[in-house]
């Protein structure tokens, strides 16, 4: 039973929405960020970079307070407006050959605690605490947690009907992504959606594990500090974007390692031979085509690595993941990369055209070896989450990557 609720969103004025909604802060280069802040006074980036107003970089709790001040200024200047009715927000993204359509809504902290909302990544406690403090100070969610659910005919039919209507927003951003958003506030449709989601057994976090964990921590702190707690306070929920699992796009993260851990090329290949059947593919770009099959780039040549299944033990859903197999057979025992999150000798690059970058980095001598994997599937993610396990860091790069400031949930 997934509890999904409508909410009164704070959202951009219709004539400014294309200027307000921003990509994730980390996606901007320093040059891009400076350009947006200099020439676009409506960008949400002004809220999350509040020191720009004074030409001063601000961090920590001081920044949190200034973020809240900038948010209030956007409200005072009518850049942001508040909806009068609780609503769901249907949002469609189109780019190249990718398209998805889902719902902005308020999801339940109680569902997170009871594992109806399922996780597949570890979170870092200090980051949870820092972001919980941030949420407590700024009093809003602007970046939704991306979740997915098993395709459902009832939900799909409701969404299809709503998409026939004229959207509230329809705009294209400079990265050539087309955005459309519909406000669903009609009581009957809202109730139908709530009822349909209640019938779902689970929601799966695709992206935003720290955001959801921090919202859970904030709810615990707020409940403890509120003697009149009822369970209906806004802090008992957090903003999410829900899409059917058939519409999510998963890319791989390739791995590049700085050195061969003191081994020569021949010694390294001999050690690999214990776990893989190795074939030299020459200098033509070569990508793996199925699970348990890897592409390796070393010393100007590509190699295919086929796992020797008779020497590797499959014990659970985690052991079947290619990212885990590579860690257990190569990265850990041969290359001595034991901490996938913090070891400076390893770097990651997400799919699409990244195998070209991987080759270039090795050719330039920045890394000794690179490994390309096939993308993990949604079924594998669900198997990990259902078993209460967590995947190695950088196992998936997931689209859509959502814009900030399109809908805001006040806490």
What are these regions (language model features)?
Residues 1-411:
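Surface-exposed, charge/polar-rich loops and edge strands
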